[in-house]
């Protein structure tokens, strides 16, 4: 399958790229800094660009079978990069007639799905503006005409891939999940349509 991965230079994104190549996919890795994607493989193409640059986004989307977004925000404070960037992806998908979109978000975007400490203390006091943009991103995707799945991982760790994780419709089972397992789940969703139009939580 031909897939574009946005956020390819991030910790979860780069793991998704590696695993996708291992599974035989043809990957277009979209990264703000191409030098941070140090992979040599016959099935990878790298596009350096800003997610807010629509023409660059469209270049990455055109000709793909599916799109994976592992975009993240690396700074606190008011920010619209997720919603604006995702808007560019969705616009390009519709123009290029690419239907399938798997998006990584986070536990906490739905009411009461992040647990008391994180949901009632950390998000409101520290991450409020970050989560406001994640919610804007979610609403854009839900209003789109693509085949979408938004996954809600809990706290991401750098532990090795286990291949064993819990998927729930509501609250996640635990507070942690290896990034490598999140990557594994997103790649499975390329062909597994069980969760289409849903927001499954993933946790260990």
List each model region and its residues.
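N-terminal Rossmann NAD(P)H-binding glycine-rich loop of SDR-like oxidoreductase domains
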Residues: 3-23
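N-terminal Rossmann-like NAD(P) cofactor-binding module of classical short-chain dehydrogenase/reductase
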Residues: 61, 65-68, 102
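Conserved Rossmann-fold cofactor-binding substructure of NAD(P)-dependent oxidoreductases
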Residues: 45-64
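N-terminal Rossmann-fold cofactor-binding loop
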Residues: 30-35, 50-51
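Glycine/proline-rich active-site loop of Rossmann-fold NAD(P)-dependent oxidoreductases
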Residues: 144, 160-164, 189-198
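Substrate-positioning beta->alpha
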Residues: 84, 151, 177-187, 198
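Conserved beta-loop-beta element that borders a ligand/cofactor-binding pocket
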Residues: 138-160
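NAD(P)-cofactor binding segment of oxidoreductase domains
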Residues: 74-101, 130-132, 136
């Amino acid at each position: 399958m031909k897939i574009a991965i946005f956020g390819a230079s991030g910790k979860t994104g780069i793991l998704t790229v590696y695993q996708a190549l291992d599974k035989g996919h043809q990957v277009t890795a979209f990264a703000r800094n191409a030098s941070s994607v140090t992979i040599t493989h016959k099935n990878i193409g790298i596009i350096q660009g800003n997610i807010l640059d629509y023409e660059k986004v469209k270049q990455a989307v055109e000709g793909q079978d599916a799109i994976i977004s592992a975009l993240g925000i690396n700074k606190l404070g008011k920010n619209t990069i997720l919603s604006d960037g995702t808007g560019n992806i969705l616009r390009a998908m519709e123009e290029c007639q690419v239907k399938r979109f798997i998006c990584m978000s986070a536990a906490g975007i739905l009411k009461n799905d992040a647990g008391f400490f994180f949901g009632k203390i950390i998000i409101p006091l520290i991450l409020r503006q970050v989560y406001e943009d994640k919610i804007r991103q979610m609403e854009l995707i839900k209003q789109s005409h693509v085949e979408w799945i938004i996954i809600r991982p809990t706290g991401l760790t750098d532990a090795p891939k286990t291949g064993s994780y819990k998927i729930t419709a509501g609250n996640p089972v635990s507070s942690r999940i290896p990034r490598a397992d999140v990557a594994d789940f997103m790649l499975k969703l390329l062909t597994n349509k069980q969760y289409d139009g849903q927001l499954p939580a993933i946790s260990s």
